Amino acid sequence: MTLQELLTDLEYELQTADGQAVSKDSERGRKLLSREISDITNDSRKAGAGMLFFAIRGANSDGHDYAAQVAEQGAAAILAEHPLVLARDGQDVLQLPAVICVKSTRLGMALISSAFYGHPSRRMKMIGITGTKGKTTTTYLVRSILERAGIDMGLIGTIEAIIGDKVIPAKNTTPESYMIQEYFHEMVEAGCDCVVM
């Protein structure tokens, strides 16, 4: 999937790795936007050739601080909240990641992740459980009731994600949006009609 296809639902400014804004319709802009994106991540340690890296500000770390590392690892693009200068003197900026500047990298990550996985939530019924207490119990009860009614179910919870017969232990109580979209995609591929979370 090209970078341009992933950015369809997003308001953004396109920049080269020297911090310069580029018109999306210019030759340089078209070259940057035509890049194939092989995968997406917000973990700089996992970013590699052809990938799109989400520079997310966290409580303990800021993904923007890892942009140069991600560029050296061959990332095709970086989603950021401010311009990034990654180019050294004499470097061809077209050999470095495209920089996509947005107001919120969290919102951008959610929209891009949905597009990357083919908008899987549009192909299943979604059930969201909210509240203060009893969410996990209610989630498992809803899943059990609907499965007994013959509905193929997926589940994303604070303990685990369940996709068909596959159980994935949770790394965090709330997965990042790109992980949720990946789970949704796997659920669609596994034939799930509905997901409860």
For the regions a language model picked out, list residue spans one by one:
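Phosphate-binding loop of NTP-binding sites
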Residues: 107-197
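N-terminal leader/targeting and accessory segments in enzymes
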Residues: 1-111
